[in-house]
Amino acid sequence: MISEENFQQHTPMMQQYLKLKAENPDTLLFYRMGDFYELFYDDAKKAAALLDISLTKRGQSAGQPIPMAGMPYHAVEGYLAKLVQLGESVAICEQIGDPATSKGPVERQIVRIVTPGTVSDEALLPERQDNLIAAVYQEKEKFGLATLDMTSGRFQLCEPADKETLRAELQRIVPVELLYCEEFNEMAAIEHCKGLRRRPIWEFELSTAITLLNRQFGTKDLRAFGVEKSPLGLSAAGCLLQYAKETQRTALPHIQSISLIQNQDCIQLDAATRRNLELTQNLSGGTENTLASVLDKCVTPMGSRLLKRWIHQPIRDVEKLKQRQQAIAEILNFDLVDELQPYLQLVGDMERILARVALRSARPRDLTRLRTALEQIPALRTIVQQKTPPFLTALFSQIADFSEQCDLLQRALIETPPLLIRDGGVIAEGYNTELDEWRMLSDGATQYLENLEKRERESTGIDTLKIGFNAVHGYYIQISQGQAHKAPIHYVRRQTLKNAERYIIPELKEYEDKVLKSKGAALALEKQLYDELFDLLLPHLGALQLASLALSELDVLVNLAERADTLNYVMPTFCDEVSVKIENGRHPVVEQVLKDPFIANPVELNHNRHLLIITGPNMGGKSTYMRQTALITLLAYIGSFVPADSARIGPIDRIFTRIGASDDLASGRSTFMVEMTEMANILHQATEQSLVLIDEIGRGTSTYDGLSLAWACAEWLAKKIRSLTLFATHYFELTALPEQLEGIVNIHLDALEHNNSIAFMHAVQDGAASKSYGLAVAALAGVPQSVIKLAKQKLTQLEKNSSHSADQQIQALREANHNQGELLFEQETDALREAIEKLDPDDLSPKQALAYLYQLKKMVG
């Protein structure tokens, strides 16, 4: 902090810097000085370390040199990209005054603040991933969450019912910045997020949020968007919009609506499920061997991003899913993949280009890419109209006629413009008469100078005379030192060099003034015309955004058709019964990485067969089998075809996985604690329509504790919840459950032992596995034979000395289960029956009856 006394000791320019920095204490300040952006004090030290640039000094503060670092203005994008990737925010301060007319320091102001969540520059963005900023608000135990994609204008909100749902939503959207209220008290739910930004409570004020949103959308109320009954979500949305305006320092016309995400409209996936199924990120944090890596061959970046949103948010609207299936079938039936994809590829990232147009930050090549995109629409429309597939025809009805806008860009811009408008050469010849005249004047300089040079050589007799130009002295006549004595008297010396003299004559000076004026006028007019292009395009922004969304969807559907054809996928069917029936299903990722043919397997889950106990050896394929069931179900619910011979799937509300676990050292949780936390979430949240995958529950504790927990969890899922469950276990005792409870079935993945080797068959068969094959797998892993031999001896000894035979252990569990079952499932009913039998309604007053009703409610939990 600079004291007032030290502040006054600084130069006016540094005082200006310090005032601007005080307004933006938490961001790096890029301060424009001529052709450089400079940073000072701690900003300079931080930037030098992060960007590997030189740290120098300038002037003094309190007797100490001021640290300084900087970079050329024309190279700033590369430095910004690196800082944004590191999670930093940067305030860009530009010179807006004219140095020639300024008294004191040139006027400067911050024109934008670049943050990880609000960037729109192409160089700063991951091409095939959404770049979202979010805000979260809390009131008691309820939450509001809003998300904004600055690169498309997509603005959404939801109200997670609890912190687990909030955590799952954040895992789905993966925001690069998350704004949270200073009074937020569930930090454990958000601490894993990047770019946490603490904001004051008043930014979440509901009435302010509603006013801001109505002003943004030009509406009187928010009923048209269906969000008026979501106050917590609106509070978060208001803070988010305010932050976006604060950082962009300009209008945001591409943000034209807001929508409400309803949890009941989508299949819910918690954070553990997204991680375990490796949808878009593998367990190592990379993108290889994920569902998206197999499924995403979209030819446009915006299509790729839309597909990933579909994967992370499968929908439950069967009619909409059937429309997607119909579209994929149409594309395949009419052989449209090869016809449509070349044109779609040229559409490119129209969505993000339009965002930059809205922010008036689009560069010349953005506009030429938009022109190219618009040029593809008639060809795409013609292909669809010729084949007349119903769904695709309806999709194209959302795309307006943009022939006028396309013609405008064709007339206005040259074929391949420079990167920036700064130096001109962007507007095409013939677009503006005045610009052509100024250009003709400046471009005619070459011929004029050649004629003047020839004339002066002849009149002076100096054959080495030549005319040149530099930025400092302008035009000049140059004569070598050996012939300088021949220079006419009207030649005025302008510069002396070691081997030559440079002169100026009135005629050349007059022409110089005219040329420089024409170049300046041409550049100023060109910049004006370029800005006017935005004015001409912005009235059509909404229609252009609808078109880009439709083209994104078309790209995804064509991609899914290509994947279905290439990978031999089939169209699944939907039914009303809560069930999953898959014939010869395959894991979509594993089958692509295996060198050997993938062994396809069936699965059938329904009312009479709702929990499968899966046994078999490690490496036998149990986890793959369970994951492929979940992935095939998920693919069906995004509208995709699936890797199977056939699939018939009923209503699913959630998918849960409890597969694998590791220590969460950062939170101080053991493997067993992580496992139990995930299991508790399933037992609390799962319903009869949930698909539940559980792999090896109870491994992280003693054998009897683990077996007891596994048995109790399986029984609870089968008897209380009745969800569709795949339950893999090494506890052979659990295979006795089908004899006691309806709806439980044993299946296993088999293996063959020969001599000391083992062969995994990877085929699912009915019944329980005959043995665990643990020692054979250990030998396969390379455990020394002497250790294997010792293990066999110990195994024989343990089996011989066991206090109970396997049958006796199972019988003991059955008896315990019977007694415990009474305690868990019947005791509640008996106590309730007894309480009701004791009740005499005629003896109760209304107040006593109400109190008794509350007591009965408490008894049932």
Swiss-Prot record:
According to its UniProt entry, the function of this protein is described as: This protein is involved in the repair of mismatches in DNA. It is possible that it carries out the mismatch recognition step. This protein has a weak ATPase activity.
Specify whether ATP-binding is a keyword of the entry. yes
Gene symbol?
mutS
A Gene Ontology biological process noted in the UniProt record is: mismatch repair
Keywords assigned: ATP-binding, DNA damage, DNA repair, DNA-binding, Nucleotide-binding
Query: GO molecular function, one example?
Result: ATP binding
Question: What is a single cellular component term in the Gene Ontology annotation?
Answer: cytosol
Q: Name one Pfam family in it.
A: MutS_I
Q: Which domain of life does the UniProt lineage start with?
A: Bacteria
Protein name as it appears in the record: DNA mismatch repair protein MutS
Family in the record = Belongs to the DNA mismatch repair MutS family.
Per the UniProt record, the source organism is Haemophilus influenzae (strain PittEE)
Binding site residues for ATP:
G616, P617, N618, M619, G620, G621, K622, S623
